[in-house]
From Swiss-Prot:
It is found in: Nucleus, Nucleolus. One of its GO terms (cellular component) is preribosome, large subunit precursor. The keyword Glycoprotein does not apply. Keywords: ATP-binding, Coiled coil, Helicase, Hydrolase, Nucleotide-binding, Nucleus, Ribosome biogenesis, RNA-binding, rRNA processing. It comes from Vanderwaltozyma polyspora (strain ATCC 22028 / DSM 70294 / BCRC 21397 / CBS 2163 / NBRC 10782 / NRRL Y-8283 / UCD 57-17). GO terms for biological process: endonucleolytic cleavage in ITS1 upstream of 5.8S rRNA from tricistronic rRNA transcript (SSU-rRNA, 5.8S rRNA, LSU-rRNA). ATP binds at residues 159-166. A motif (Q motif) lies at residues 117-143. Residues 67-77 have a biased composition (Low complexity). ATP-dependent RNA helicase required for 60S ribosomal subunit synthesis. Involved in efficient pre-rRNA processing, predominantly at site A3, which is necessary for the normal formation of 25S and 5.8S rRNAs. Residues 19-58 form a coiled coil. GO terms for molecular function: ATP binding; ATP hydrolysis activity; RNA binding; RNA helicase activity. This is ATP-dependent RNA helicase DBP3.
Length: 530
């Protein structure tokens, strides 16, 4: 082999070697890239799998949360949990309850809480539970309002007197203290304040609530005028629940004897009556002394007239309105038989003696009869006349001391006296059991008061009779009375129709017969009382 051939062979060999190296290098690079690509793909697949798993887990978690939230929306509201057995009650049964009891609920927040058809549907302090369970079942106003009150909502309760309103606001009030104060409920001073228009009604509310407060170790006191203040000052210092009339309470506030800064549960009972008696400014001044935030406010009353709505809108926060029966239009209890007799005014007292013989003869001799006069002087005269004719009569009117009025009510309630003679001071709110007959000796100044008077009978599902003596002097009220009689399906005497059926709109002393309609769905404006 020539030298050139050897050289050429060596050159080619070197070229092949370079090519091999390049190829090897390329193969190595390709292999590395392939490996990297595979690793990237594995990482991506792994990541995708992980993300998919997390997404699925999150989705399942969200579904679970939505499911829980759905249950929570229907069963738990602001600390109030609907009972499991209550949730199982068919909707048809709930609808029947609302229809049968003529229940209407205005609730802009759409909570739709179910009424408590049984005491077993509510969870309270065991001592309270034991006390209320002595009754067969909650009354309609209790059944519907308790869930909203236990959920901390402001509530307007409108129902006829004798419907269980005192326990409707009283049971949640006392449970509220026990829940918020724990083992030391007495450390926070006055926490529940109930304002009532009259001394008699305040005393009645106190008598009902003290049964509960005694059971759970709370102090309750009743504050009203006509008696010395010394004992009331002492009681206010140690009480957690206070029932009061506006005038006396304001006096004690101004003296520094009543500290309302911890009141978180405020009740206005018979609010319309308090406005009629001119207590609006007193009420505002009292409210100013309570907590401005975190206060639960309630109105419980037999009627809900337009003149009260504006007041409610100033200090209630999106209230739930619970109405039992027809409350926007004046209506009488349909369980009461109404008899209206048109008579000469000079023959009324002789007629009264005839009626007492009729309603208290034979087996009815001990039946309770409540007689209404219009003025205290008239009441005093009629009382003397009845005593002269051999009747044992108890009386309540403005010329009597508070102690005399309290004794008279006690005699009538316990049966030591079967006749109670009263002016309209006793017409509103008083719970006098088993009154068989109401006699209106003199017709009241308004038909509203007539409805409240006759509402002293036919209470708590019972029947009763109201016998009214109507004279030409009241003919301007004939039209309104006819409407009430027709609304309750009662007969209207021809003599009454002769006075005409025109209805005069009720007038306010300041605003006349023109009221502003108030939209209660609007949120209350926050105001500061100066």
């Amino acid at each position: 082999m020539s030298k050139d051939e050897i050289k050429d062979k060596k050159r080619k060999s070197e070229e092949y070697e370079v090519v091999d190296k390049k190829k090897h290098k390329k193969d190595k690079k390709d292999k590395k890239e392939k490996k990297d690509k595979k690793e990237k793909k594995l990482k991506k697949d792994k990541k995708d799998k992980k993300d998919k798993k997390e997404t699925k887990s999150e989705s399942e978690s969200n579904e679970d949360n939505e499911s829980v939230a759905s249950v929570s929306t229907s069963s738990t509201v602001d600390g109030y949990t609907e009972n499991a057995d209550l949730l199982k009650v068919p909707q048809s049964e709930i609808d029947e309850f609302f229809t049968t009891n003529e229940v209407a609920v205005e609730d802009e927040s759409k909570l739709n809480l179910r009424p408590l058809l049984s005491f077993s549907h509510i969870s309270l302090d065991s001592r309270i539970q034991a006390e209320i369970s002595k009754f067969p079942k909650p009354t309609p106003i209790q059944a519907v309002s308790w869930p909203y009150l236990l959920a901390g909502k402001d509530v307007i309760g409108v129902a006829e007197t004798g419907s269980g309103k005192t326990f409707a606001f009283g049971v949640p009030a006392i449970n509220n203290i026990l829940t918020k104060s724990g083992s030391k409920p007495g450390k926070n001073g006055i926490q529940v304040l109930i304002i009532s228009p009259t001394r008699e009604l305040a005393s009645q509310i106190y008598d009902n609530l003290v049964i509960l407060t005694d059971k759970v170790g709370l102090e309750c006191c009743c504050v009203y005028g006509g008696v010395p203040k010394d004992e009331q000052r002492t009681q206010l210092k140690r009480s957690q629940v206070v029932v009061a009339t506006p005038g006396r309470l304001l006096d004690l506030i101004q003296e520094g004897a009543a500290n309302l800064s911890n009141v978180n549960y405020l009740v206005l009972d018979e609010a319309d009556r308090m406005l009629e008696k001119g207590f609006e400014e007193d009420i505002k001044n009292i409210i100013r002394e309570t907590k401005s935030t975190g206060r639960q406010t309630l109105m419980f009353t037999a009627t809900w007239p337009k003149e009260v709505r504006e007041l409610a809108s100033t200090f209630m926060n999106s209230p739930i309105k619970v109405s039992i029966g027809n409350t926007d239009e004046l209506s009488a209890n349909k369980r009461i038989t109404q008899i209206v007799e048109v008579i000469d005014p000079f023959k009324k007292e002789r007629k009264l003696l005839e009626l007492l013989k009729k309603y208290q003869s034979g087996s009815k001799k001990d039946d309770k009869v409540l007689i209404f006069a219009l003025y205290k002087k008239e009441a005093a005269r009629v009382e003397r006349n009845l005593n002269y004719n051999g009747y044992k009569v108890s009386a309540i009117h403005g010329d009597l001391s508070q102690q005399q009025r309290t004794n008279a009510l006690d005699e009538f309630k316990t049966g030591r006296s079967s006749i109670l003679l009263a002016t309209d001071v006793a017409a509103r709110g008083l719970d006098i059991p088993n009154v068989k007959t109401v006699i209106n000796l003199t017709f009241p100044l308004t038909v509203e008061d007539y409805v409240h008077r006759i509402g002293r009978t036919g209470r708590a599902g019972k029947t009763g009779t109201a016998h009214t003596l109507f004279t030409e002097q009241e003919k301007h009220l004939a039209g309104s009375l006819v409407n009430v009689l027709n609304g309750a399906g009662q007969p209207v005497p021809e003599e009454l129709k002769k006075f005409g059926t025109h209805t005069k709109k009720k007038e306010h002393s300041a605003y006349g017969a023109f009221y502003k309609d108030v939209d209660m769905t609007k949120k209350a404006k926050k105001i500061t009382f100066d």
